[in-house]
Amino acid sequence: MEKDKTFKYNTEIIGTTKVHSVKSDYKIRIKNEITYKGLEDDLYRFNIVESLYALDDYEDPIMTQIAEMTNRICSIYKEIEIGINAEGIIEKVFNRDQIRDKWQKVKAWLTNAHPLESYEVIRAKEFELSNEEMEIKNIRFIHFLHQYFFIFRQSVDSGGTKYIKKNEMDRFGAGVVIPVNINLREKDLENGAIERNYEGKMVRDNKVIERLRQFTKDNYMHPEYKMTGKYVYDNITLLESDFTITEELGEFYYNHSYLRLTLEE
């Protein structure tokens, strides 16, 4: 991993959500620049700049308004400097002061643009920003951060399989953390690159299932959470990755997202 070298990535997200009787297709385009800044206190330090976030398609007008507020809040992280451990988990945010300065402007916009709808959103974000651990827990699920660092520095013995357990956040706003068992496989490609494939399935945790049932108000619902992906590396440079998440919470809640990340030439 070459220090101070910047790589540019394009991410395309295509998906479908269903909340009660409302079903929506959506498409998002994202561009990011990522620079490795070196090893500091056993953490890999990265500077990440988001140069584009475009919500190209979202059918439901109510969900569009929610997406608009969410995207504006996430804009405070358009430039973020983070410390990652060897497992790809964010452990430190180095530019928290700059992020808080940006939040004050976003907070003013939310108050003027959506005075009623944004009240609880603002209160929740203010609480999160006062708690670094909670802030890190949430920002790790920003699309690019989550996908890029998902199997950061993970590898398997030649011809073997590695088993990983990760905690995933549900995609419906319930705030439930879902344990997922992941099966990681690796193979060498003819061009010298390495391909890593994984499959992940939800662990049947009774406490998690109970919380999801409370959220959906369905005492008999059997949740499903599945993930699949492919990562291609040239040495330690990520060339491309496919990332699919499927979540189903009973009859009325469904989400399927396909994320495609490519290195810009």
Predicted regions and their residues:
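Hydrophobic transmembrane alpha-helix bundles
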Residues: 85-88, 117-120, 259-261
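Acidic, serine/threonine-rich low-complexity disordered tracts
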Residues: 1-84, 153-265
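Acidic, serine/threonine- and glycine-rich low-complexity intrinsically disordered segments
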Residues: 90-201
